[in-house]
Amino acid sequence: MGLFTVVFTAIAALSAVDAAELLRSPNSKDIVPNSYLVVMKDSVSSADLDSHVSWVTDLHSESITKPGVKNLDGFKHSYKINGWHAYSGSFDSETLASILDNDQVDFVEHDRYVYIDGLVTQKDAPSWGLGRVSHRMNGTRDYVYDETAGSGITFYGVDTGIDIRHPDFGGRAVWGTNVVSGTGDNDRHGHGTHTAATATGTKYGLAKKANVVAVKALNDHGAGLWSNIMKALEWCVDDARKKNALGKAVLNLSISGGKVVAANQAITNAANAGIFVSVAAGNDNQDATNKSPASAENVCCAAASTIRDEKASISNYGSVVKLYAPGQGITSATPNNSTGVMTGTSMAAPHVGGVGATLMASKHIAPSAVCAELIKMATGAVRNPGANTTNKLLYNGSGQ
């Protein structure tokens, strides 16, 4: 009897050790109750994921007869990004426990809210970012750039949508997809149009000949869920593959939230598929190490600089920041044939994305090598960049 007890205890302990971990968030205010991101182990195939999802769906069907469970949706969406597999859903505690015990699951994380990183300040003010990134020395508004101007590069603006009819896009913008239920295929906020035009606009942008694809993943108030951002990333990779644009694509994420490992992995795998990913450092005036997407691997994270080549007061900083780029008082296009001025690392990121697109077009550099090349080209100009942070300011290599 004693031997049986010892063996049974050992098996139970082994099961507990093998169970997947539910990653805890240091900040609970942005967590979506009962909603989870489930990341599968590397050995899990696409077919394995489909079978696993069927199993989870059956579990949920059994659970919805229990009190308090009927309002949970169960499985929502599966993610297949460059060989990386995950899914999202809302589950009761018993179903979650079964998922954690499944040997195909790597870890589980709460779905969380994420927000834009731009602040509207005023309308119709002159811009300065274009001139700054095309000159080593400060003080000029002339924008000097390679004539290829991002030609042949596809820019994915994952944001609040894009006003694709705005004249600043010159007919180069198309609607891609909308993953936010209950919203229209438009940009009622303005943030998405502003960031896309900063990167690609004919007047306000850097890569003036790039193709533009609108991907709506944030609602009309500038907020969203990481589960939807991941869905948008999956769509972008699939769309780029269909268009033979992998290796010739840029994706911008001007958003920020608490660190979410599942989201970081999705972003990294999108980058690894052959897309240059520019991201915002965040607007909390703190170290961006614990922020997503800033902390994701293989992305080019931008902090915001001022017209005086100083760190913008709200900009995050830290070792994950690869470059500073103009981010304070940036004029760009906004919906309904308008313009506006916004401030934040949301504006810095598309500067990096736009220069990255021009570099890919003119020098035929692979997306995976773009950020390192931008760092190599950059000007050491930013004063008081923050602790453990580069002082490198984005430069497009114009020779000026």
From Swiss-Prot:
Protein family membership: Belongs to the peptidase S8 family.
Peptidase S8 domain location: 127-400
Purpose of the protein: Secreted subtilisin-like serine protease with keratinolytic activity that contributes to pathogenicity.
Cellular compartments annotated: Secreted
Glycosylated position list: 138, 252, 336-337, 388, 396
Active site: 159 (charge relay system), 191 (charge relay system), 346 (charge relay system)
Residues in the signal sequence: 1-19
Pfam families: Inhibitor_I9 (PF05922), Peptidase_S8 (PF00082)
Domain Inhibitor I9: 35-116
Propeptide: 20-117
Catalytic activity, EC: 3.4.21.-
Catalytic class of the enzyme: hydrolase
GO biological process annotation, one example: proteolysis
Gene: SUB11
This protein's name: Subtilisin-like protease 11
Keywords: Glycoprotein, Hydrolase, Protease, Secreted, Serine protease, Signal, Virulence, Zymogen
GO molecular function list: serine-type endopeptidase activity
The keyword Membrane is annotated on this UniProt entry: no
One GO term describing the cellular component: extracellular region
Native organism: Arthroderma gypseum (strain ATCC MYA-4604 / CBS 118893)
